[in-house]
């Protein structure tokens, strides 16, 4: 998700690095960076955090307002440098400043603590618990009562991206907040287009933003995965509500399966970079594999056997295509060997798929090739924008895959870097500049969600969509896979018998 160039038309320069560089020079001028004392944050951080009421709305806090302030423990109430408190009363749209013993502020703080206690707060120590608390509260403030999960709290971030929202739903489910998770999934189901896909982003009222931005097909993979995760972790809380979400999950899975071409891969298009690729890209193929596996398992659990078989077969076909087209060249961004390492390689690992040694090696290689001097990573090796700026969602993906793999050393290193580059209010920003300063807006919902999942993975394995297998339930059907090879002017047919998934 590349929010830093929303609405700027910058995607036009995605395939033309030289033009992009020239534009950057023209924008920044030739005078270099402003001196360190020119402003509090050398990077243009717009929002440092939020205060708000989970049941209604939230108010952004600027970096200047955040100076010297800190939240009361496990709350959305700010203690100001002078000792007063600032919070958003229930049902209000404006924050108020009150004395330190104000009953309304105390009640607001108690409400958020009670909400946190209703779920789990991941982490293996007090520091990680505080990070999780803040991330959960920030996600709750970014989620409107109707389930609209906003990407961020400022201007061009105040929209719903289906990918980001799906991750936020999974983070809520992973921490026991299944009601919040359901509301997000219900919103996405209601916003789904008639063809089973989604537009790139949506307004908070569920209407699509039709600004010419290309659709990102990965949504039809992320949504079924999120529904599956909510369902399998919810126990009795989800049993009676799954049928309301199943039609949208089925529509997304149908679209994912139908998108696979003769090569078994989805077509090229806009990935999470929000830039078009001519070749099939990993940022789409991997989520679709995850979503198809999740949909197959969900259909099986719900007794929709024909759907389960279709999605299982599509997932197997896509899996074979990924191994054939991406694995031999190290899982780069696209099927082109020169497309460079990409953070999307993490989508092939737990908790999105079972562990594979080759994928783990590719992740380690990508981390080495992408790591910047400031310690974070950009989306990919051939990222056409500022090469000194790290993006926190992509950095967090490396933390998640390391944590899910049980690689405590790598996970701690990535999580430590992310924690050290939060805003003064503990929110994860979208970007971190070359000087290590937070940039753009915070909190960023996608990063907050991924970090929560990484911390949750430290407490135990996260559910992973199973690779579909044949079972007595489907009658043990056998699929004949016929491949042809040209031999001496004729066709030699090789027939392989395999039990269907």
Question: Model features per residue range: what roles?
Answer:
Residues 67, 71-97, 146, 150-159, ...:
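The feature captures the catalytic groove of carbohydrate-active enzymes
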Residues 120-129, 173-185, 230-250, 296-316, ...:
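Structural helix-adjacent loops and short alpha-helical linkers that scaffold large soluble proteins
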Residues 131-147, 177-199, 244-265, 312-330, ...:
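Long, well-ordered core segments of solenoidal/helical folds
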Residues 158-260, 285, 428, 441-459:
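Aromatic-rich carbohydrate-recognition surfaces in CAZymes
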Residues 168, 213-230, 337-357, 394-484:
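C-terminal capping/lid segments that line or modulate ligand- or cofactor-binding pockets
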Residues 214-218, 243-244, 279-290, 301-302, ...:
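Extended ligand-binding clefts on enzyme/binding-domain cores
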Residues 489-501:
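C-terminal membrane-anchoring or membrane-association module
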